[in-house]
């Protein structure tokens, strides 16, 4: 079966321009497109263009950050005629099939090969060994949320042999990592097309929404800790040249950890949950509500703190408001997550309390309101609970 655009998919003008821009750049580059504008479909339209140029003989590898995105991408790939191999978790679930289909592809028995994997599996030694056997002249790589691929443990796994490289992200530049960002663009190519939030809303590609910040004061202990961390950050930054914006955190782990620790403090501020409850009590009806907790970019010890925060939020919503609230985190299995999303859309779950998993690219069209407790916005001793409200009826 050919990898091609299904008849019922009508590319929007901006998607066609994105495909043309990437092709004009020699088959390399990054698409910087606002979340919700159809980066997935745009990239698959690009792959369909490549397949047509190659007489349908193409090996396509798609790397995404999280397991639940593998399943989401798989549905779209099947719409384009692909029969993807889902390569993540245990090798026994995918390696034999991948090696078999790769052998058929090399022999010319199979026209197309499509693999969807997580960034973690992509970087693994076992996957890299298989990847090294792919015909470089017919190999295309799509990296979803490409900014993640600039991390030290991931950028080393990017295969130099592959010539067709497409990166996708609403925010391709890495936070306080100029070196990682530069190496990312050196590999994937520069940003070849941009489609921002304002333009997308103006053109009707995204719905309008209200963004409402709610100020929350830090407790006395949190304020003291925040000031101490800020002084430490200033001191460490001064040793690196004095300008935090010009500091490469990869060369200053102490500064990196201090910034993450301060972000954790703001993201899990004690009074945010109290303010959230106050706001929800003002609602006539609570349904199809997303609540974001913690900072998905923070790992290790910091991750433990944010997990406790998400648990506390869910428990409070149940106990004080009687809400049918459920967690949506990396701890839930693939089947559990799919069930949660289905129940949320049906209205059986009134609120999903999420950390990290919903931040990047998961489709939840039923959402009416989102509360973001994880905002890093702060001034002195205050932080914010941010509300997004869909204005579409």
What do the PLM-derived regions correspond to, one by one?
Residues 93-107, 127, 290, 309-359:
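Conserved helicase ATPase core of P-loop NTP-dependent helicases/translocases
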Residues 148-209:
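Post-DEXD/H (motif II) to motif III coupling segment of the RecA-like Helicase ATP-binding lobe
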Residues 40-45, 56-80, 297:
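Conserved Walker A/P-loop ATP-binding site and its immediately adjacent core
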Residues 1-32:
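Conserved pre-motif I regulatory segment
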Residues 26-48, 353:
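Walker A/P-loop
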Residues 236-340:
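Conserved helicase/translocase motor-coupling segment
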Residues 353-355, 360-375, 381-386:
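A short beta-strand element within the Helicase C-terminal
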Residues 93-137, 148-156:
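Conserved helix/coil segment N-terminal to the catalytic DExD/H
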């Amino acid at each position: 079966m050919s990898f091609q655009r299904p008849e019922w998919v009508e590319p929007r003008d901006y998607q066609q321009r994105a495909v043309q821009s990437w092709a004009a750049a020699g088959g390399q580059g990054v698409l910087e497109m606002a979340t919700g504008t159809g980066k997935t479909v745009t990239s698959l339209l690009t792959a369909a263009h490549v397949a047509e140029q190659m007489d349908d003989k193409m090996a396509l590898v798609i790397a995404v950050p999280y397991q639940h995105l593998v399943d989401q991408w798989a549905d779209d790939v099947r719409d384009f005629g692909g029969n993807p191999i889902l390569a993540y978790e245990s090798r026994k679930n995918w390696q034999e099939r991948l090696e078999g289909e790769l052998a058929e592809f090399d022999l010319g028995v199979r026209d197309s090969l499509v693999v969807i994997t997580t960034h973690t599996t992509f970087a693994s030694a076992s996957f890299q060994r298989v990847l090294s056997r792919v015909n470089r002249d017919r190999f295309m790589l799509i990296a979803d949320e490409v900014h993640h691929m600039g991390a030290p443990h991931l950028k080393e796994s990017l295969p130099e042999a592959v010539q067709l490289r497409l990166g996708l992200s609403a925010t391709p530049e890495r936070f306080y990592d100029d070196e990682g960002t530069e190496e990312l663009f050196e590999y994937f190519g520069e940003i070849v097309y941009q489609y921002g939030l304002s333009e997308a809303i103006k053109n009707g590609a995204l719905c309008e929404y209200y963004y409402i910040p709610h100020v929350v004061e830090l407790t006395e202990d949190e304020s003291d800790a925040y000031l101490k961390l800020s002084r430490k950050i200033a001191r460490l930054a001064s040793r690196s040249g004095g300008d935090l914006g010009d500091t490469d955190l990869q060369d200053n782990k102490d500064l990196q950890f201090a910034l993450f620790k301060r972000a954790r403090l703001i993201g899990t501020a004690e009074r945010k949950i109290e303010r959230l409850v106050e706001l929800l009590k003002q609602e006539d009806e609570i349904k199809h509500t997303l609540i974001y907790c913690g900072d998905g970019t923070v790992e290790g010890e910091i991750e433990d703190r944010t997990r406790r925060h998400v648990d506390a939020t869910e428990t409070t919503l149940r106990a004080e408001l009687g809400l049918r609230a459920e967690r949506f985190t990396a701890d839930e299995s693939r089947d559990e997550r799919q069930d949660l999303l289905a129940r949320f859309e049906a209205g059986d779950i009134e609120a999903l309390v999420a950390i990290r998993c919903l931040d990047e690219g998961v489709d939840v069209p039923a959402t009416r309101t989102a509360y973001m407790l994880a905002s890093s916005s702060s001034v002195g001793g205050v932080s914010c609970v941010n509300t997004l409200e869909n204005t579409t009826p």
